[in-house]
Each structure stands twice: as C-alpha cells, then as structure tokens.
Swiss-Prot record:
This is Elongation factor 1-alpha. The lineage of its organism: Archaea, Nanobdellota, Candidatus Nanoarchaeia, Nanoarchaeales, Nanoarchaeaceae. Pfam families: GTP-eEF1A_C (PF22594), GTP_EFTU (PF00009), GTP_EFTU_D2 (PF03144). Residues 91-94 are annotated as: G3. Coiled coil: none annotated. It comes from Nanoarchaeum equitans (strain Kin4-M). Transmembrane segments: none annotated. Its EC number is 3.6.5.3. It comes from the Archaea. Belongs to the TRAFAC class translation factor GTPase superfamily. Classic translation factor GTPase family. EF-Tu/EF-1A subfamily. Residues 70-74 are annotated as: G2. It is an enzyme of class 3 (hydrolase).
Length: 433
C-alpha cells in the first residue's frame, strides 16, 4: 500500500495588514478551493458597483464579514494538498489569536509562512511573531514578501526587505537550513502564490505553493521518554481498566510497565499494559500522534483522572513543585503581580497556579532581559517568572520534552498568557518499583 502523504501544520504569521488573510484566501482561490457559487455571487456584486477587477478583494471582505457574523467560512482552517504534502493552515490571521493558538491550538505548527509587506518592511509584529515561532520550536520558515505591486515589482526593494528579514531571522537563532525560501509576490494579484509571476522575471525561485511542497514532515519524537496525557479512565466489563489518550512522545507496547502521575495514589498508579487499541483495532506498538485506548493490569479506574500523565516506570513523568517559565502576557484587565492565582492549562490538565516571583521582563523581540524584578506585567510584555502549582500537575522542561513544556494561563474565560517551562523543580515522590 502506498504510504499516505505526510501531514504538515503551517501557521501564517506577520504584522497586521501585511496581507496574511489575502495570501491564504488567494491560495485557496487559485487552487479552486472556493466554491464557484461563492465567486459568482461576488462577481455579480462587483459588477453592480462597476468594479469587476476587485472580485478578489470583495471575496476577502465578504469572508471577513461572514467571519465577523460567526459564519463558518473561516479562512483560519484551510486544508490543501501539494504533490508531496497534506498541508493544514492552522491559524487565523489576527495577532492575539495567533499568539494564543501557538500554544493552545489543537495542533502545534510544524512550519510558518512569514508575510512581510514590501512597502513597509519588517515591523514590530513581524519581529514578535518570528520570535514566538522560534520560542515554540518552529524550525521551518517560508518568507513571502507581499505587496510587490506597491513597489512596482522592484528587485532592489525586494533585496532590501529580504536582507532585513534574514538579518532578523539570523539574530533570533534561525540558520540558513531553517529558511526554505524568500519569495517576492503580490497575493492580491496572485503573483507567485500558486502561479509563477511574469512581472518579476528576475526571480527564479519557487512560488508559495511550491515552497509549501518543499516542507519536511516533523520527525516523530519516538526517542523521547514515553508521555501520554490521559483523556479518560474507563472500566470495561470483561476487560478491566482502560485508559485513553494521545501518545505525545515515546512508544508504548503491550507488556510495558507504566506509572501514571500525579494520580489519586500518593506515589502514582503503577500497572502493566495488557493490550492497546486504536480505532477499534489492536496495536502492537503505539507511536506519537496515535490516539489510543490501552488496558492496564494493576490500576483501578478511580486511581486515574483526566490530566494525569502515563510514562514508563523507569522514566516517570515529572510532577512539578515549582516552574521557572518564559511567558508572554496576552490579556489582563490591569496587570499581573506576585500572588496572582489563575489556572494553568497544560496538555489535558488544568490546575490553579500562583505567581511566586516576577524575575525579569524580557524584550519580546530579542529575548534579552530589560528589567530585573519588575513590580507588574502588562499585556504585550514577556517575562521570566516563577510559578507554583497549587495542585499536583505534570509538566516537563521545554528543552527536554517540548510537547509537555508549553502551557497557557487562563482566567475569567480568557487566555491571560502563554509560555514554556524553562526549569521544573520536581516534587519528591517515592516510587515503589
């Protein structure tokens, strides 16, 4: 059987109004992913106003309006296919959403398309988004220098902006091999989106669509320690206890000895895997990305709850006593100060957490500490902080197990901040092997 094409999640990033949604919309349009009936309606509308050449702009506006009214023609979640890849465009345009979804999005992005307007060049959010992409471990970047029509498709201006962007990407730690392509284009007119533009004969690199085809699928983190955040614990007649969850890292086989932490048992729930199923079919080995149910001997349904994490007994998950984290503040009605106690969301867990120390404000564009021990943190600021979970929770250092090192902080029904765990002080747990 031919192997299915790899799935790659791509996030579109860049400064507000540099054309992220137009670029995604144009990609859909040129690939025939926008229903003809939708186009027809808009053509009629455009004719009425004598602006037939603006059909595409109308299309985008129409979708924006429909989004505002809550209709589901959402550019945000686009699926498309290239000769080698299935691409899911994970993210909606919009700064706040982007920042939030980098962390809480159902799927972590594997690659990013950085959209930069040729007339404006690198702006504040260009920089901030690029830093966030780097922080969250995105290591493939396509740069699309948009609005070349605004600078008369001038090669000199393209080279200037290209150099600005490359300088920024190198400064924050990207290397040449992380940068797939730097493409001049004008997504409004479809230049170098899917079709090669005839307005820039001086450019002979890939189009955006071709660059998406060049992306490599992420390596499955099979060599990392086993971690399965638990979604549910069931008791099934004739089988016994069944745990369900998505394998984030490592691999699981029948016969493996596992421990589930923090669990209702003070020293963790220990058991042996009897069998594994995915989509009602038995599995000999579960790998990262697999959503599985596995039956265990020695663990009762009541020992385990959603938010606990299963690992191998000889390499147990880390239950955190304290966490030193790098956070980006997204929203707060006033400011975050020491003593603030919102809710930490990580993998399938959410627990109350307290801000113990604000160690230093960080420049979100460079990662440099700009103020030691600040009094308060406001939206738009980044900082290194010390957090204390007020209930037991598993979280891992981002540089060791990134899948369990990203988190969001929520309060009042909103995402207050997102972050990564830099250091985790483990709770002392006596594990009886």
């Amino acid at each position: 059987m031919p192997r299915e094409k790899p799935h790659i999640n791509v996030v579109f990033i860049g400064h507000v109004d540099h054309g992220k949604s137009t670029t995604v919309g144009r990609l859909k349009y040129d690939l025939g992913l926008i229903p003809e009936s939708e186009l027809e309606k808009i053509r009629e509308e455009a004719k009425k106003y004598g602006k037939e050449e603006f059909v595409f702009a109308y299309l985008m506006d129409r979708q924006k309006e429909e989004r505002a009214r809550g209709v589901t023609i959402d550019i945000a979640h686009t699926e498309l296919e290239t000769p080698h890849n299935y691409i899911t465009i994970v993210d909606a345009p919009g700064h706040k959403d982007f920042v939030k979804n980098m962390i809480t999005g159902a799927s972590q992005a594997d690659a990013a398309v950085l959209v930069v307007a040729a007339d404006d060049g690198v702006q504040e959010q260009t920089q901030e988004h690029a830093v966030l992409a780097r922080t969250f471990g995105i290591n493939q970047i396509i740069v699309y220098i948009n609005k070349m029509d605004k600078v008369n498709y001038d090669q000199k201006r393209f080279e200037e902006v290209k150099n600005q962007v490359l300088k920024l990407l190198k400064m924050i730690g990207y290397k040449d091999e992380n940068i797939i392509a730097v493409i001049p284009g004008a997504s409004f007119h479809g230049d170098n989106v899917v079709k090669k533009s005839d307005k820039m004969p001086w450019y002979n690199g890939p189009t955006l669509y071709e660059a998406l085809d060049m992306l490599k699928p992420p390596q499955l983190p099979v060599d990392l320690p086993l971690r399965i955040p638990i979604q549910s614990a069931l008791s099934i007649k004739g089988i016994g206890t069944v745990l369900t969850g998505r394998v984030e890292t490592g691999k699981l086989k029948p016969g493996d000895k596992i421990i589930v932490l923090p669990s209702k048992k003070p020293n963790g729930a220990i058991g042996e895997v009897k069998s594994i199923e995915m989509h009602h079919k038995p599995l000999e080995e579960a790998l990262p990305g697999d959503n599985i149910g596995f039956s265990v001997r020695g663990i009762e349904k009541g020992d385990v709850m959603r938010g606990d994490v299963a690992g191998h007994l000889d390499n147990p998950p880390t239950v955190a006593e304290e966490i030193v984290a790098l956070i980006h503040v997204i929203y707060h009605p006033s400011a975050i100060t020491v003593g603030y106690a919102p809710v930490l969301h990580v993998h399938t867990a959410h627990v109350p957490v307290r801000f113990e120390e604000l160690r230093g404000k960080v420049n979100p564009a460079t990662g440099q500490v700009i103020e030691e021990n600040p009094q308060a943190l406001r939206p738009g600021e980044a900082a290194v902080v010390k957090l204390k979970p007020l209930k037991p929770v598993v979280i891992e250092p981002f540089d060791k197990i990134p899948q369990l090192g990203r988190f969001a902080i929520r309060d009042m029904g909103r995402t207050v901040a997102i972050g990564i765990a830099r250091q985790v002080t483990p709770k002392q747990i006596e594990i009886k092997k």
